[in-house]
């Protein structure tokens, strides 16, 4: 009898472990659910409204840092986000894409209002003072450095490129590296919905 109970207990434990493994979700992006950074932002959107992460509660929020004069990474990422929204179909209503400028000197409210919605009318561009942008970038662990080129007003900004994803409650969940495929991003977002 004791042998039977031990076999029964062992099989129940194995079953419980395998059920737990079946519940694990495998994301294409990096799971950063336990990160202790990138908690919030306090900036202004391209319509002049003050914005915080909590303003988008109830939606998945994708946050990307860049600048409007960026020749490659930023427009590519925003184009990929447009593709993600198309792949989501009607579920796109549950997602908010947020672009935070790293170039407050050139990226005015008016410029952001033209640039960001040109990719998708629902995308939001955020800006602030240099001090505000530096503070938010530091909190999000986003590297950015101005690189002067020919001419006084001609410069580029080297910056880290990736997208943060928050769930509907405002908790940081995923990080997508630059170049992550739109279908992979869309699949991960569907798993979070």
Predicted regions and their residues:
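C-terminal motif of bacterial Sec signal peptides marking the signal peptidase cleavage site
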Residues: 15-16
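Thiol-/selenol-based redox modules, centered on thioredoxin-like
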Residues: 151-193
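Thiol-based oxidoreductase modules, predominantly thioredoxin-like and allied folds used
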Residues: 95-106, 123-131
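Typically the conserved alpha-helix immediately C-terminal to a functionally engaged Cys/Sec
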Residues: 73-88
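Short, internal strand/loop/helix patches
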Residues: 113-160
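Sec-dependent N-terminal signal peptides
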Residues: 4-12
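Short active-site neighborhood of thiol/selenol oxidoreductases, capturing the structured segment around
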Residues: 54-75
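N-terminal "domain-start" segment that seeds a small globular fold
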Residues: 22-54, 79
């Amino acid at each position: 009898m004791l042998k039977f109970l031990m076999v029964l207990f062992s099989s129940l434990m194995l079953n419980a472990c395998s059920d737990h493994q079946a519940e694990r979700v495998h994301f294409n992006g990096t799971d950063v659910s336990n990160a202790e950074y990138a908690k919030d932002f306090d900036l202004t959107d391209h319509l002049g409204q003050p914005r915080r992460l909590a303003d988008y509660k109830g939606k998945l929020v994708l946050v990307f840092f860049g600048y409007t004069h960026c020749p490659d990474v930023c427009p590519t990422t925003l184009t990929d986000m447009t593709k993600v929204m198309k792949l989501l179909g009607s579920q796109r209503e549950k997602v908010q894409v947020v672009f935070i400028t790293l170039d407050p000197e050139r990226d005015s409210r008016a410029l952001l209002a033209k640039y960001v919605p040109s990719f998708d009318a629902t995308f939001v561009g955020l800006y602030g003072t240099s001090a505000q942008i530096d503070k938010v970038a530091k909190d999000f662990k986003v590297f950015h450095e101005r690189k002067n080129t020919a001419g006084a007003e001609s410069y580029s900004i080297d910056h880290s490129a990736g997208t943060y994803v928050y769930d509907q409650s405002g908790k940081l969940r995923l990080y997508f590296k630059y170049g992550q495929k739109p279908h992979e991003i869309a699949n991960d977002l569907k798993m979070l919905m």
